[in-house]
Amino acid sequence: MTLNLYIYSGLGNIIAIVDSVREDISLDTEDVLNLQENEGVNFDQLIQVLPPQDPEIDFDVKIHNNDGSVASNCINGARCVAKFIEDHSLSASKQLKVNTIGGIWRLESMSEGNYSATFLLSDVIKPICISHEEMYVNLDCISLGNPHGVAFEETNPKLDILKVGKDLQNNSLFPDGVNFGLANKVSSNEINLRVYERGAGETLACGSGACAAAVIGIANKEMIAPVKVNFQLGSLLVDYKKENNMISAIGSAAFVEEIVIES
């Protein structure tokens, strides 16, 4: 069997995409792990693009983290999927509805290599305080199809994102793990963000993490939408409409390479 992997980057978040629309390919957790351990393919998430089961939807996707676990959302991956569909002419439309297990992505191809991903916020923010190495961490938690806990440095100085992120994966408050974001407020509409993703560790960028931090900033930190969220290799512009609970994230997506694996 020949497997073509299309590698994309969403602000440094490496996304491997599998075309299960034109090819009869289905990958499970073991296959995802094998690609890394035996084939030497490195990625943060792997996304299979599938034919839709619902005629009102353009495509379905299945998302795996690099530890093989199934993910419910990946906004950097969503933009990469939009570019992949455009690159391979899988749809003539620049506006798409894509189904994930965490909800519907509304994707749009924009100018200058940018793509937007819009989705419904169906959760509320829950503040919690946890103990970590003889100190307390104040987290605002929210689910965007996947769980997020965000700490702002102004109320949580001197946090080690790697230690806290790893510790949270074993916390009983998060039985399925959690994506941990550490945000630094630059201004009323800009933050710097680092994210420790469950199942992947710290990544160069996390789109859903950016959305979580922006929504929490708007709701609890007197921030003004849209919020520019900066990562090491670029930024996302995140908008949140309280009146309809819709979140949108605009940013770049880039094709990196195609990897062909024979088995």
Sequence positions of predicted segments:
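A glycine-rich beta-to-alpha transition motif near the start of alpha/beta enzyme domains, typified by
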Residues: 1-111, 150-263
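Short, solvent-exposed secondary-structure boundary/capping segments
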Residues: 113-120, 247
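C-terminal domain-closing interface element
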Residues: 123-125, 130-149, 246-263
